[in-house]
């Protein structure tokens, strides 16, 4: 069988009905022993299992928002750190620092969030992780 290009495969899929595509996906999953389920659905399914227990959910949290609560006395140093942590320009970083409390990083990995918090606090800022 000749190898099909991505465009040829997409053209073939465009001609199929939803039922035919659904059957194709099932057969593909069985043949290659994979799942086409979105990883988000797995994470969302795990959330209700935690129930009302907030403490264990916080321990397992792997994404954090770094919130700048205040710049403190060394505003220029904090602006420099914000620019170093983000891709913001000087004006945008200054506006962010002056309008605190504001998120500096969103959905950052735990290690990155902690490093950012330490750097901002070393520059004189007050920071929280959420």
Curated annotation (Swiss-Prot):
GO terms for cellular component: cytosolic large ribosomal subunit. Belongs to the bacterial ribosomal protein bL12 family. PANTHER family: 39S RIBOSOMAL PROTEIN L12 (PTHR45987), LARGE RIBOSOMAL SUBUNIT PROTEIN BL12M (PTHR45987:SF4). Coiled coil: none annotated. The gene is rplL. This is Large ribosomal subunit protein bL12. Homodimer. Part of the ribosomal stalk of the 50S ribosomal subunit. Forms a multimeric L10(L12)X complex, where L10 forms an elongated spine to which 2 to 4 L12 dimers bind in a sequential fashion. Binds GTP-bound translation factors. Gene3D superfamilies: 3.30.1390.10, Single helix bin. Keywords: Ribonucleoprotein, Ribosomal protein. Pfam families: Ribosomal_L12, Ribosomal_L12_N. GO terms for biological process: translation. GO terms for molecular function: mRNA binding; structural constituent of ribosome. Forms part of the ribosomal stalk which helps the ribosome interact with GTP-bound translation factors. Is thus essential for accurate translation.
């Amino acid at each position: 069988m000749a190898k099909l290009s991505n465009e040829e495969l997409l053209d073939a899929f465009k001609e199929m009905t939803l039922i035919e595509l659904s059957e194709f996906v099932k057969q593909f999953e069985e043949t290659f022993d994979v799942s086409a389920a979105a990883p988000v659905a797995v994470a969302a399914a795990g959330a209700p299992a935690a129930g009302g227990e907030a403490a264990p959910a916080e321990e397992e949290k792997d994404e954090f928002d770094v919130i700048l609560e205040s710049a403190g006395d060394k505003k220029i140093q904090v602006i420099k750190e914000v620019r170093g942590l983000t891709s913001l320009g000087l004006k945008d970083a200054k506006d962010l620092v002056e309008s605190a409390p504001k998120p500096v990083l969103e959905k950052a990995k735990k290690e990155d969030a902690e490093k950012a918090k330490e750097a901002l606090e070393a520059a004189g800022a007050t920071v929280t992780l959420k």
